[in-house]
Amino acid sequence: MRPSRRAPDELRAVSLERGVVKYAEGSCLVKFGDTHVLVTATLEERLPPWLKGQGRGWVTAEYGMLPRATLERTRREASAGKQNGRTVEIQRLIGRSLRTIVDLEALGERQITVDCDVLQADGGTRTASITGAWVALADCLNWMKARNMIKGQVLRDNVAAISCGIYNGTPVLDLDYAEDSEAETDANFVMTGDGRLVEVQGTAERTPFSQDEFLQLMALAQKGVARLVDLQKMAVG
């Protein structure tokens, strides 16, 4: 039995609310159960120096957690003077995931920066961030299209992410913190709307897992991502 009493293949309650920040070109408040992330997408008429003059744009991401997103206060990274390794890893993952489904040439020589700020953390902050980031990005691109700044289909597909793991010997979908901290195995799957893999992160925390168990986790992830993609499409209309 899962602590949340969910079925093994059951997502937490998920919501994706678009257009929640009035100043941002795109925004989304994403909730995976008690994990809440505010995502904004900002259009910038600038590019990294190494991209200038190449006729294509760029999508990048930043990630952070509010000090009381967790049970005990976490020191702000700004006060420490540097980002920790986990933060850097996650924001690079978010940026990579988004770029796989964006036509950077169609975007033109401009950059979209996606900021993911964790308001409350209960497991799965990176997967919630990626899922909400797609909505904020789509919101931003719709804003640009309404102003004739872009033409055609800049977004090639959806992208969403979900965690899976083996908890008490059972493969389960969408781990919350209580499950993640006790899981024998946990993995994060990033997938496109048509089911292709973007990235897989998997770790045996206590017991090595077999190929069959991995395939069971991937099957759960495919089911979960398909549901998330449906919710993304509903959110952007």
From Swiss-Prot:
The keyword ATP-binding does not apply. InterPro entries: ExoRNase_PH_dom1, ExoRNase_PH_dom2, ExoRNase_PH_dom2_sf, PNPase/RNase_PH_dom_sf, Ribosomal_Su5_D2-typ_SF, RNase_PH, RNase_PH_bac-type, RNase_PH_CS. Pfam families: RNase_PH, RNase_PH_C. The keyword Lipid biosynthesis does not apply. Its EC number is 2.7.7.56. Belongs to the RNase PH family. Homohexameric ring arranged as a trimer of dimers. This is Ribonuclease PH.
